[in-house]
A protein has these predicted regions:
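Bacterial N-terminal signal peptides
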Residues: 8-16
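Gram-negative (and chloroplast) outer-membrane scaffold detector with strong preference
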Residues: 75-153, 214-221
């Protein structure tokens, strides 16, 4: 249910961008995916029963295991160079087996989506290469993280979506026009999220997570 709600909110945000665009503005809708990783980060908190934890977690992305890493974005291009958009990115992190075993966790995952939703500014340089077909671009965005928290430690078992804190995203890529309507693209995308999750026994878990992804995608322009 919560996953459906997140998807609906993302679609509503994309639709609102389209609704506010003037008739002559260029709109684009993009879908993307690719390998995504996350470096180690510190995990702090308590299980709600008096057990505190503070350790460095090794994260695994498992980008192509269900549910896979993917993203969708809508952009309203005000002119040839400047655009505004909304980006929903289903990134995920699993604590490694060694991390869980060393620190007493049965589960430690943000895996049915770390779910980074951001409002972005885009800047592009149209037709710079390949006879005008290649367009480099950059983007930055601010938003929120809405992960599916799957944490089990001692008698505390947490399983569900939460709004856990602020997020930022940054992108650099290049787009190749197939024709007037369709384009393919490749990009690097990074995210940072500062997460504070509530555990079911009254405890909490805090961690800051960085993700790095190399994406390929398809864009529809209208």
């Amino acid at each position: 249910m919560r996953r459906t709600t997140i998807a609906a909110l993302s679609l509503a945000a994309l639709t609102s961008v389209a609704a506010t665009a003037p008739a002559r503005a260029e709109m684009s809708l993009s879908f993307y995916g690719g390998p995504q990783t996350a470096p180690h980060s510190r995990v702090k908190g308590d299980d709600g029963d008096g057990t505190e934890f503070n350790f460095l977690s090794e994260w695994e992305g498992k980008s192509f295991e269900a549910p896979p890493h993917y993203g969708v974005r809508g952009v309203w291009w005000r002119d040839e160079n400047l655009g505004f958009g909304v980006d929903f990115n289903h990134v995920k992190v699993y604590a490694s087996d060694d991390t869980r075993e060393d620190n007493g966790f049965e589960n430690l995952e943000l895996t049915d989506g770390l779910n980074i939703l951001t409002a972005n500014v885009f800047y592009r340089w149209p037709g710079q290469f390949a006879g005008g077909a290649l367009t480099p671009y950059v983007s930055g965005g601010l938003g929120i993280a809405v992960p599916h928290v799957d944490v089990e430690i001692n008698d505390s078992e947490t399983f569900g979506y939460q709004v856990t804190g602020p997020a930022v995203a940054w992108i650099a890529g290049v787009s190749y026009d197939l024709n007037d309507r369709w384009a393919v693209f490749g990009e690097y995308k990074g995210t940072f999220s500062s997460n504070e999750a509530d555990l079911d026994n009254g405890g909490e878990l805090k961690t800051d997570i960085v993700t790095n992804a190399l994406n390929v995608g398809l864009t529809l322009k209208f």
